Amino acid sequence: TFNSKIPDNVPSEMAPLAEPLTIALHALHRANVKAGEYVAIIGAGAIGLMAALSARHYKATPILIDIVEERLRYAQKLGVPYVLNAADDQVIDAIKNITHGTMAQVVIEASGANSAIRNTLDLASFAGRISFTGWPKQETSLPTNLITYKELDLRGSRTSAGEFDEALRMLSTLEINPQDVVSKVVNLDEIPDAVKELDRYPERYLKINAVFH
């Protein structure tokens, strides 16, 4: 078991954000992200956004990809330098231009969409590292010849491995500002309505926290 003390300056209603932040951090750690590298992140939900902000903290350059324009605009407002709408932009060409032809040394797949999982191979550089943290509902066929040709490393990432202390520190020092990611805080009796609202308007929310009173 892991026991981590919540810093005094992290409000109780924001502390649960540490758990999804550990998922984002673990995905980056699994891919062994380094300063100066380009990190393409597919999925601009809470985990994808925090992966982008954490990559920036590690002095890498994040490129965040999604099909929800509102999430991309919000990420850009928070300082993510490159955002791409997969529904509109020519993502491969755009990343080629951003990276001066090398493509991304690290790719984080945080959407779970089968098509996005397949596309990670095209976004990665030669000898690139791909970290899969999204949960697909079905199997995805991948061209193994491309994996071999580009010498890609594919790594699953589904949990955290000692990242809670780092996550809490980042929340405490506002390297990741919890207010930027928690869209709404509700009481326990408000959860059913919050779930309906989230299901109806997913573009409006990143993370909803429920608290005891």
Regions found by a protein language model. Give the residues of each.
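Glycine-rich phosphate/adenylate-binding loop and adjacent beta-alpha elements
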Residues: 1-3
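Mid-domain Rossmann-like dinucleotide-binding core that forms the NAD(H)/NADP(H) cofactor-binding site
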Residues: 10-88
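Glycine-rich cofactor phosphate-binding loops and adjacent beta1-alpha1 units
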Residues: 31, 73, 78-153
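Structural detector of well-ordered beta-strand residues that form the stable sheet scaffold
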Residues: 40, 63, 129-131, 155, ...
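Conserved acidic E/D residue at the C-terminus of a beta-strand in Rossmann-like folds
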Residues: 66-67, 134, 158
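C-terminal hydrophobic helical "lid"/dimerization subdomain
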Residues: 118-122, 161, 165-213
